[in-house]
């Protein structure tokens, strides 16, 4: 900007303010008391604007920000962890906040803005405010320890399951409700001898032969391959389900979240 243009802009500002901001003499120009006061505040304002622009640039280019996720222990450990590792390597300056809660608690955090996205066990009740995207198909299978090896070879009918000691997740779990619903639809009521809040504990208890339990097959491959657990075929089997990503509709997606979602390998849509 040329000097005449600067001088004209200052005079226009003085006219608008109704007071001279500069004292002009043959030896130079210096600010009036009003000019000094205005400059002090404008300097702060311009500094804040510049800082805001820099922070915005950093967020857009993934140089700062926060990724806030809600999910259960099982989903975090068996599905999200590899993506979180890759994300952190790509964007080390993004703060990652993962809150481990049940499906319903995660949805509550999503609705109150505490997290930007949930990765939860499906299905959930339809809600027009939620955008649900399946991520991976999973299969619930019945397993037992060495004591039940013969049962694994023979298989069983669901109606006979109440004859055996059963270990299940607590009834607040969406996975537990899914198993209960499956059993009830087939005329069977499940009465576990023990209810636990952790899938890992169910696996550990089943390994020491405390009872049978339902696990997610895809997340229990190591125990099955090492023969610490044995899959018991049940007729009818539990219908397959999915782990899904849930976001609030009509809510802008933070750049930090978009960068994470771009890493996830979603199932291809079938024609």
Where does each model-flagged region fall?
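Alpha-helical linker/hinge and terminal dimerization helices associated
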Residues: 16-17, 38-60
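Central regulatory/effector-binding core of bacterial HTH transcription factors
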Residues: 64-126, 196
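A late-sequence structural motif
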Residues: 79, 230-271
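Hydrophobic hinge/microswitch elements
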Residues: 102-115, 121, 174-232
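Flexible hinge/capping segments at coil-to-helix
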Residues: 129-166
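Secondary-structure junction motif
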Residues: 151, 165-186, 253-262, 270-271
């Amino acid at each position: 900007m040329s000097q005449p243009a600067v001088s004209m802009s200052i005079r226009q500002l003085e006219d608008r303010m109704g007071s001279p901001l500069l004292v002009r003499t043959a030896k130079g120009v210096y600010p009036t008391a009003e000019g000094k006061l205005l400059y002090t505040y404008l300097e702060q304002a311009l500094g804040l604007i510049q800082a805001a622009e820099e922070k915005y640039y950093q967020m857009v280019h993934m140089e700062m920000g926060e990724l806030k996720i809600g999910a259960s222990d099982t989903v975090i450990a068996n599905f999200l962890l590899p993506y979180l590792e890759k994300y952190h390597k790509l964007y080390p300056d993004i703060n990652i906040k993962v809150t481990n809660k049940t499906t319903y608690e995660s949805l509550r955090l999503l609705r109150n803005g505490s997290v930007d996205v949930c990765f939860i066990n499906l299905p959930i009740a339809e809600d027009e405010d939620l955008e649900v995207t399946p991520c991976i198909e999973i299969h619930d299978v019945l397993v037992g320890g060495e004591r039940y090896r013969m049962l694994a070879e023979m298989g069983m009918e669901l109606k006979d399951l109440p004859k055996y000691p059963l270990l299940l997740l607590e009834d607040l779990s969406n996975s537990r409700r899914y198993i209960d619903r499956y059993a009830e639809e087939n005329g069977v009521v499940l009465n576990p001898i023990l209810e636990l809040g952790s899938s890992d504990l169910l696996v550990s208890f089943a390994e020491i032969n405390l009872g049978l339990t339902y696990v997610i097959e895809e997340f229990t491959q190591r125990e099955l391959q090492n023969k610490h657990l044995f899959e018991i075929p049940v007729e009818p089997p539990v219908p397959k389900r999915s782990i899904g990503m849930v976001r609030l509709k009509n809510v802008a997606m933070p750049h930090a979240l978009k960068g994470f979602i771009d890493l996830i390998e979603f199932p291809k849509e079938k024609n």
